[in-house]
Amino acid sequence: MMKTLSSGNCTLNVPAKNSYRMVVLGASRVGKSSIVSRFLNGRFEDQYTPTIEDFHRKVYNIHGDMYQLDILDTSGNHPFPAMRRLSILTGDVFILVFSLDSRESFDEVKRLQKQILEVKSCLKNKTKEAAELPMVICGNKNDHSELCRQVPAMEAELLVSGDENCAYFEVSAKKNTNVNEMFYVLFSMAKLPHEMSPALHHKISVQYGDAFHPRPFCMRRTKVAGAYGMVSPFARRPSVNSDLKYIKAKVLREGQARERDKCSIQ
């Protein structure tokens, strides 16, 4: 199955097996959108704008292979529990963000981690131990004074101890401290190309008038020694029906992969 990303002189088709979704969760005002902004365009926005739910898409050409990463920047208020559950079900990699100067936001991350494990276990034959979920616990605002800290590093690290698919980072979206390193480790845990990390690929900008004719991106579709990334300018959140189909297809692919593994072992 192939996903068509744009039309015109150049059509970008991404194999379904190379399409992933990153879900960013956490309480309000902890810096989720700032971290996403750093990931997408390397910028930090000083002005706070409450997020209801933002959807972004980044397309990569990595040594000639096409990849797609959808980014779901969720609301900290979670007014619609059913939508929160659907967002978790569709997620492949997760970033749980709290503020180092807010104990309440850390408690919310602990609740979210538990909810993710419970929800995703439904896709793994209801066995939590079978769920391998690449996840980063992210303590943001480490540029603030230690006097403001309400969450000790050792306490936060307990959330990831003993889980090779979970890591803890203290970052500053404002100062861009440890942000690139965090994404590198997250993609490594998910067995995704390292070049998907912000610092490891060339960024291609698409102007408004060129959005449906991304010729510079197409010119790099051959097998070349390089990695390129482009933020889709007109990304739209898929419908609920599309998300449900996505979940079904993903479960089917994972089941087929497990069967192949069993056959190879036997």
Swiss-Prot record:
UniProt name for this protein: GTP-binding protein Rhes
Effect of mutating C263S: Rather found in granular structures translocated to the nucleus
Locations listed in the record: Cell membrane
Tissue: Prominently expressed in the striatum, weakly in the cerebral cortex and the CA fields of the hippocampus. Highly expressed in the hippocampus and cerebellum, only during the postnatal period. Also expressed in pancreatic endocrine cells (islets of Langerhans), adrenal gland and stomach and in a thyroid cell line.
Source organism phylogeny: Eukaryota, Metazoa, Chordata, Craniata, Vertebrata
Quaternary data: Monomer (Potential). Interacts with GNB1, GNB2 and GNB3. Interacts with PIK3CA and UBE2I.
SUPFAM superfamilies from the UniProt entry: P-loop containing nucleoside triphosphate hydrolases
Family that this chain belongs to: Belongs to the small GTPase superfamily. RasD family.
Stimuli inducing this protein: By thyroid hormone, efaroxan and glibenclamide.
Subcellular location, principal: membrane
Cross-referenced PANTHER family: GTP-BINDING PROTEIN RHES (PTHR46149:SF1), MIP08469P (PTHR46149)
Transmembrane segments: none
GO-annotated cellular components: plasma membrane; synapse
Native species: Rattus norvegicus
Topology in the lipid bilayer: Lipid-anchor
InterPro entries given in the database record: P-loop_NTPase, Small_GTP-bd, Small_GTPase, Small_GTPase_RasD
One Pfam family per UniProt: Ras
UniProt-annotated binding residues for GTP: 26-33, 73-77, 140-143
Residue positions bearing lipid (S-farnesyl cysteine): C263
Propeptide boundaries: 264-266
Region of interest: Interaction with GNB1, GNB2 and GNB3: 189-235
Task performed by this protein: GTPase signaling protein that binds to and hydrolyzes GTP. Regulates signaling pathways involving G-proteins-coupled receptor and heterotrimeric proteins such as GNB1, GNB2 and GNB3. May be involved in selected striatal competencies, mainly locomotor activity and motor coordination.
Molecular functions (GO terms): G-protein beta-subunit binding; GTP binding; GTPase activity; phosphatidylinositol 3-kinase binding; ubiquitin conjugating enzyme binding
Post-translational modification summary for this protein: Farnesylated. Farnesylation is required for membrane targeting.
Key word tRNA-binding present: no
